Amino acid sequence: MVKYSAIALLLLSIQVIHAQNTVCFDIAANPNADSTAFSDFTKYIRVLDCFSIYAESSIPDEKVLHAAAVAAELLDNDEDGEVDDPVLKAELAANGALIPIFAYDGSSAMDNFFDHYDGEGAAAVLWRNEIDPNNPGYWGADATVEEVVHVINAIGHTNIYPGAFAVEPNSSLLTTAMDVARGGQFIQHPNNYPPEAWYHYDDYTCDYECMAIEYLYWCIVTNMGI
């Protein structure tokens, strides 16, 4: 049976998107600078001993701190200094969950990272121009909440609670709900969604599993009120 108390991430308070950058984080030097994949990052924050932030030197400190604050709020919504779900913490740590922050799409650091990274912990990235600490989580202004949620879901929840969150067709409560929202099960993108569909995600680079991760994100931020 799925431990539904563990999926409380879906019911997070709207306060989570108002994470402040004055939390108790310090930006450290990159501890993995000798690794080819990580060699272009100079800024690093370890969040709650299970989630890492890596950033290029050109990323302003306030944006790096903002990403760390959002991750901390999502993982520790009651702000007691511990990840709310210890099983999730263990899974994220075991898989090396991380989010890299690049100067821009296609930067040399980004190319180097994806040419050499062979881990399981990178499910999303951030770019400098899509982080806005003054508008946390708001669509079109700040992508931090979206991308951090993607990492937590893809690296954590899909693995530890597959009955709820697995992303393959016919595999979970999530995919069943998404198929209803899309007006049917579409492994490939339809040319047009049925009239009864209310989830019309149309990014043709996003396959079925990607669609499920995006749908879970929209469920979460809808509950947040974003």
Where is each model-derived feature located?
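Acidic/His-rich structured neighborhood in mature extracellular/periplasmic domains
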Residues: 38-40, 48-189
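N-terminal low-complexity, Pro/Thr/Ser-rich intrinsically disordered segments
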Residues: 20-49
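Residue-level detector of alpha-helix boundary/anchor positions
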Residues: 6-9, 137, 205
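Generic detector of isolated residues embedded in canonical secondary-structure elements
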Residues: 18, 70, 215-216
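Metalloprotease/metallohydrolase-associated module, dominated by Zn2+-dependent proteases
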Residues: 170-226
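Bacterial Sec-dependent N-terminal signal peptides
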Residues: 1-20
